[in-house]
Curated annotation (Swiss-Prot):
Pfam families: RbsD_FucU (PF05025). Keywords: Carbohydrate metabolism, Cytoplasm, Isomerase. GO terms for cellular component: cytosol. The active site is at residue 20. Belongs to the RbsD / FucU family. RbsD subfamily. PANTHER family: D-RIBOSE PYRANASE (PTHR37831:SF1). The lineage of its organism: Bacteria, Pseudomonadati, Pseudomonadota, Gammaproteobacteria, Pasteurellales. GO terms for molecular function: D-ribose pyranase activity; intramolecular lyase activity; monosaccharide binding. GO terms for biological process: D-ribose catabolic process. It is found in: Cytoplasm. This is D-ribose pyranase. Catalyzes the interconversion of beta-pyran and beta-furan forms of D-ribose.
Amino acid sequence: MKKTAVLNAQLSGVIASLGHTDGLTICDAGLPIPSEQQCVDLALTKGIPSFLSTLEVVLTELFVERILLAEEIKQANPTIEQQLLEMINKLAQTQGRQIEIEYVVHSEFKQRSNQAKAVVRTGECSPYANVILYSGVPF
C-alpha cells in the first residue's frame, strides 16, 4: 500500500503525469467540467471532501509554480481565499520559491480550467472555491 498522502489511485496517477506548466484544477461541486476532460470526481456529498482538505493533500505531492483564482472569490468567499493563500505561502517556503498568484474573472477562469490537464471535483458547496495549480519543476 502507498504510504504517501494521496491514496486515490486515479488522483495519484494524474499528479504523477503532470509536466512542467500543466494545469490541475481543484474545484467545488458546481464548476462545469467538459465531458471530454479528465475528471477525478471525489465528491461524496455536500462538503465531503472539502475543497481545502483536498487542496492540502494535493499540495503534499505537487510542485507548484503558479496558481489561478477567480477574482470573485475575494468578495464571495474571503475565508476560503485567505486559507488557500496561507497554504500557498507555506508551500512556497517549503519549495524555496515564490508561487505566482493570478486572478481573472470567473468566466475566464472556466475557460482556462477547460484547458487544464485534469480536474479534481470535491464536495465543496461554497462559491468560487476553485483553483488551477500549474506544475513547476523542483530543479
